[in-house]
A protein has these predicted regions:
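Short Pro-Cys-Gly-centered "Cys-loop" motif that presents a nucleophilic cysteine in a tight turn
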Residues: 1-78, 87-205
Length: 205
């Protein structure tokens, strides 16, 4: 069974009901969901992620997501933080993936940038928000895309943005171009065009 079949099957049984979203402050994590918006902030708001570190993070995260059977819907790396929208049958898989990812990032940064060796890089663990409404999941695509495009509008770049795949149609695992139509009833190209031409307020409404 491929990712699209899995998600389509789960959509028949998942209750995207009241939109209540547990987050990861202290022990308040809702571990019963399938879709999560996760953020990871750099310690003290430092501009941790340059292009090199962002590329390494994306490459390793893709490998780990395949290993842990996680599907990535959206991902951007900003200089001071990251945004990922993920699907997994088991929240523990996501948690384990980030544990390995962040440990590897610390080692990579210490090796490549000796001046940062021994420094704290991250604000504790990632923040997890479970997604229980389809509208919320749909909106997050625009929210994540807006992070990257806002940098471009300022003449800067997001160190990494997954939306190059939406532009050229070349999706790589753990992404899957067919998932967006399975979820939202709209092909990825039309979805991306909608995100680019509508504001966050328009997408939410």
């Amino acid at each position: 069974m491929n990712d699209v079949d899995k998600i389509t099957g789960f959509l028949d049984s998942i209750a995207f009901s009241d939109g209540s979203a547990g987050n990861s402050k202290r022990n308040d994590i809702d571990k019963e969901g399938f879709f999560y918006h996760t953020t990871q902030k750099a310690w003290g708001g430092m501009a941790l992620f340059n292009n090199d570190i962002a590329r390494y993070r994306n490459h390793l995260m893709c490998e780990l997501c395949i290993r842990y059977e996680i599907t990535v819907l959206y991902s951007v790396v900003m200089p001071t933080h990251t945004h990922d929208v993920l699907y997994s049958k088991n929240w523990r898989n996501i948690s384990d993936m980030y544990r390995v990812l962040n440990s590897s990032l610390v080692r990579y940064v210490s090796h490549r940038y000796p001046q940062r060796k021994g420094l704290r890089l991250f604000c504790e663990r990632p923040q997890y928000t479970v997604i229980r409404e389809m509208l919320h999941l749909f909106f997050l695509g625009k929210y994540v895309e807006d992070n990257a495009s806002s940098r471009e509008n300022e003449g800067k770049n997001a160190p990494y943005s997954c939306f190059w795949m939406f532009e050229n149609g070349h999706f790589q695992p753990p992404y899957n171009k067919d998932i967006y139509e399975a979820l939202f009833g709209i092909p990825f190209k039309e979805l991306y065009e909608f995100y680019k031409t509508h504001s966050k307020k328009e997408v939410w409404v």
